[in-house]
A protein has these predicted regions:
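Extracellular/periplasmic, surface-exposed regions of secreted and cell-surface proteins
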Residues: 1-248
């Protein structure tokens, strides 16, 4: 009864490889002066040879002011007062598995005509690709302060940061439709994010032994497009250089 059902089977397989090396150097002088250097060397098969490997360094330093000798008389009131600063790079392989290679898609039961009562298998000609795609790079700069007062009952931290995302994957400038295919994506977009975060907490114990804690978190951030060449006419329906994400 009812309409017959034609069973179909579909499948997909892809393969890609990553490899990375990581190193870290720490220095701590009497808990007052802190220094750290990191290095990453990452590779991905999603890019062509020559663009597969990239080095991503980072560095951070801290000064625990509360451990200085001139702070000893008020250590009961100020248990921690640490200033932090850091700068670093990370990579993002934000591309498809075979996006730098021309591939032919094959689809079963996909034709608009029938052969022996069944839709035939179809294949699509490959489009244009960019052979120069490479890693997106996220550059982060952060300044922070950790504090704890009143025998660590009042504690918190404040961070101010700037994060720049370089060489994001974006659409290339449009070409005439007579080309007959879509324009490939390229590393042509940059984004800058500015923000801050504040965390304040209070932990204490009542006279009956009951412990309690409360915390408050505040944050704000905005992102600005600093490079986007695919909208030279500044069309409102597309991203614009200098525009803040989310602006109306």
């Amino acid at each position: 009864y009812g309409n017959p059902v034609d069973p179909s089977v579909s499948g997909n397989m892809s393969r890609w490889t990553t490899c990375g090396f990581f190193g870290r150097l720490n220095y701590d002088y009497q808990g007052k002066y802190l220094f750290e250097v990191n290095g990453r060397y990452d590779g991905s098969s999603r890019f062509r040879p020559g663009n597969q490997w990239k080095f991503f360094p980072s560095v951070s330093a801290g000064w625990n002011i509360a451990q200085e000798n001139f702070m000893q008389p008020i250590n009961d009131w100020i248990g921690q007062l640490k200033l932090r600063v850091s700068y670093g790079n990370l990579g993002n392989q934000n591309v498809g598995t075979y996006q730098t290679y021309q591939t032919i898609g094959v689809y079963a039961n996909n034709g608009t005509w029938l052969q022996d009562g069944l839709k035939p298998m179809t294949a699509w000609a490959p489009g244009l690709v960019s052979q120069n795609l490479t890693w997106e790079t996220i550059q982060s700069f952060n300044v922070g302060l950790d504090f704890a007062f009143l025998k660590d009952r009042l504690h918190g931290s404040f961070d101010w940061y700037v994060r720049k995302t370089k060489n994001m994957i974006g659409n290339a400038p449009e070409l005439p439709s007579i080309l007959g295919t879509a324009v490939p994506v390229t590393n042509n977009t940059d984004l800058r994010t500015n923000g801050w975060e504040l965390t304040i907490g209070w932990n204490d114990r009542l006279s009956n032994g009951l412990q309690y804690g409360i915390s408050l978190n505040l944050s704000d951030a905005y992102a600005t497009i600093t490079r986007y060449p695919n909208n030279p006419s500044h069309s409102l329906g597309n991203y614009i250089e200098g525009q803040r994400i989310g602006d109306i």
